[in-house]
Amino acid sequence: MRKLLVCLIGLLPIFLISTVQAQTVVRLDPALDKIVPPNAQVEKLAGGLGRIEGPLWVRDGGYLLFSDLNAIKQWTPGKGVSVYHDRTFSGPAPEGTRVGTNGLVFDSEGRLIACEHGNRRIARWERNSSVTVLADRFENKRFNSPNDLVRKRNGDVYFTDPQYFEDLKIPDPDKVFQTDMDYSGVYRVTAGGKVELLIKDLARPNGIAFSPDEKKLYVANTRPRKFWRVYDVNADGSLLNGKELLDVTSLPEEGVPDGMKVDTAGNLYATGPGGVLVISPQGKHLGTILIPEIAANCAWGDADGKTLYVTARTGLYRIRLNVAGVRP
């Protein structure tokens, strides 16, 4: 009996490790139980990709688009991953470098608008396959490396423009990626084509999202401090009263504040340390959906908008939730 007890005690750590490894959600507040079902599981849909970002669900076709290095890929239920567009950077670039598109969104006519990281611009892809540049500079200086974007219902596009090429250390003998600006910015391109600088005091602005009523704008900052900031949106589209929503610099898990989306109740689904953090409109961290790789962005998908798709380094994941998301 004693030997059996010793054996069982010896096996206990194994059982505990298996339980931790199988954990899908860290629940920090009872409010999360209404959002994430008790039996919810993170499902891996694809792996072995390059460095994926910018997921966007195509409702008409029932598939997901996402950026992958210098291409846009497509994931279709029952078919898997295929190439949607094989080259999104117009210049030469070493294999495996992140110079293609990043954030993706549709306009009111269903045309794709993209943050073109390497081309340093915001561009709209027309139905005849031509490209219309919506913005590529401010005050005659080229953007740094447009990262993520969100479209307001009136047609205005808000986007982040961090100085990331310094971090990527891409070979650049012709100084193609040399920045003209001494700051990272958040901008708006109005429906009429005017470019406006809204924020310039964030070190590395990244993900960006509106509240459901578009009266608040959320912006992620990746480093050196890891936090999300929230702004009031004036009737004219300008921003004011910026304040910190949540700081996660002290969290030990891998990952930084990156892409994010909101649900119809106003909760924020923000990729960051450990996976996707669920944050209330008041800035309370309700819990984290754990992702096996460093999560970069997320998007609402499926017919009912209750599936959250997550791009994470080389893998594509999803999880079914009880709530529907706000979709462009």
What do these predicted ranges mean?
Residues 6-18:
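Bacterial N-terminal signal peptides
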Residues 21-328:
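Sequence-structural signature of mature extracellular/luminal beta-sheet repeat domains
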Residues 1-4:
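Positively charged n-region of N-terminal signal peptides that target proteins for export
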